[in-house]
């Protein structure tokens, strides 16, 4: 026999569902509006959510194709969006891999080894990470300007310089992976040592396979942070062809001519790499975030 819910419980359930729907609508509306702007004729930021007439002109320009106007004029692509997208994926991918590698080895040292000043180093890393990157922009510019004189591939206007700058943001990830490592019983590594494994082999063959969920989380968070970052990339990159998509999209918002439709199409394209990476790694995301809590 089905249980009859009291009216008060039904009302609470209805209100809960209504609030959830309103919350989802508040999140989805800006995204749908950006898509709608990219499908409208002209470069206008205002208008209905559903375009009266769908136009693919902005998408053609973003993909590098010329567009023929009604009067016969040919409009070439104003900016190399696909090149910017590739630059973004390249910089974010290499940065994320480097951050995972550095964070994992540092976290292993803090979780398994004993050395003087370990607690001080951990706290210091976390404190320095609390300050926003914009506070160090002047210092970063001077640093990479000087580094470029000796090591050209990590100087100004190079992707290597941007990647090198992003590798500095590992403190929070070190804490997260350290907490995950501390949840793994050290007896597994001791058993591997009894079988003749070196510390490096125990780390590589025992600890790393058990840490795939948290490594996937760190990779996703690092990838998203790098592909959406603007201040550091806009400071270090000068050449238009070297821009990442997040930096290059600002070129559409010229004070004399706001290209909102083209900007919206490029904005939607910028979300594709993040969506693909998230979908590929989502099965590890919840487990990694749950088990990777910072442990004292």
UniProtKB/Swiss-Prot annotation:
ABC transmembrane type-1 domain residues: 85-281
Cross-referenced CDD domains: TM_PBP2
Membrane topology: Multi-pass membrane protein
Keyword Transmembrane helix on entry: yes
One MF annotation (Gene Ontology) recorded for this entry: ABC-type maltose transporter activity
Protein purpose: Part of the ABC transporter complex MalEFGK involved in maltose/maltodextrin import. Probably responsible for the translocation of the substrate across the membrane.
The protein, known as: Maltose/maltodextrin transport system permease protein MalG
Signal peptide: none
NCBIfam families: PRK10998.1
SUPFAM superfamilies in the record: MetI-like
Any one cellular-component term (Gene Ontology): enzyme IIA-maltose transporter complex
Single GO biological process annotation from the record: maltose transport
Keyword Hydrolase: no
Residue stretches spanning the membrane: 19-39, 82-102, 124-144, 151-171, 205-225, 260-280
Periplasmic face of the membrane: 40-81, 145-150, 226-259
Gene designation per UniProt: malG
Keywords annotated in UniProt: Cell inner membrane, Cell membrane, Membrane, Sugar transport, Transmembrane, Transmembrane helix, Transport
Further comment: When MalF EAA loop mutations are made concomitantly with MalG EAA loop mutations, a complete loss of transport and complex formation is observed. This suggests that the MalF-MalG interaction may be important for the proper assembly and also for the correct function of the transporter.
Family in the record: Belongs to the binding-protein-dependent transport system permease family. MalFG subfamily.
Subunit structure: The complex is composed of two ATP-binding proteins (MalK), two transmembrane proteins (MalG and MalF) and a solute-binding protein (MalE). Protein stability and stable complex formation require YidC.
PANTHER family, alphabetized: MALTOSE TRANSPORT SYSTEM PERMEASE-RELATED (PTHR32243), MALTOSE_MALTODEXTRIN TRANSPORT SYSTEM PERMEASE PROTEIN MALG (PTHR32243:SF50)
Subcellular location: Cell inner membrane
Topology, Cytoplasmic side: 1-18, 103-123, 172-204, 281-296
């Amino acid at each position: 026999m089905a249980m009859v819910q009291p009216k008060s419980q039904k009302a609470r359930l209805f209100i809960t569902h209504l609030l959830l729907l309103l919350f989802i609508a508040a999140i989805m509306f800006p995204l749908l509006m950006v898509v709608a702007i990219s499908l409208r004729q002209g470069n206008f930021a205002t208008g209905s959510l559903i375009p009266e007439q769908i136009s693919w002109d902005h998408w053609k320009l973003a993909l590098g194709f010329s567009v023929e106007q009604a009067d016969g004029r040919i409009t070439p692509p104003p900016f190399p969006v696909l090149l910017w997208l590739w630059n973004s994926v390249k910089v974010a991918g290499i940065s994320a891999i480097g951050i995972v590698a550095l964070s994992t080895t540092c976290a292993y040292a803090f979780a398994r080894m004993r050395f003087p000043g370990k607690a001080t180093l951990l706290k210091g890393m976390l404190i320095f990470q609390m300050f926003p990157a914009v506070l160090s922009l002047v210092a970063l510019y001077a640093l990479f300007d000087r580094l470029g004189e000796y090591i050209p591939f990590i100087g100004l206007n190079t992707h290597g310089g941007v990647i090198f700058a992003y590798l500095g943001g590992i403190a929070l990830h070190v804490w997260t992976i350290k907490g995950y490592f501390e949840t793994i019983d050290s007896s597994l590594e001791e058993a591997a040592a009894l079988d003749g494994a070196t510390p490096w082999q125990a780390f590589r063959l025992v600890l790393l396979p058990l840490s795939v969920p948290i490594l996937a989380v760190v990779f996703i968070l690092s990838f998203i942070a790098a592909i959406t970052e603007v201040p550091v990339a806009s400071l270090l990159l000068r050449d238009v062809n070297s821009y990442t998509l997040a930096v290059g999209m600002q070129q559409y918002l010229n004070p004399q001519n706001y290209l909102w439709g083209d900007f919206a199409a490029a904005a939607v394209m910028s979300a594709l790499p993040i969506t693909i990476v998230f979908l590929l790694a989502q099965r590890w995301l919840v487990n990694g975030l749950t088990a990777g809590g910072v442990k004292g």
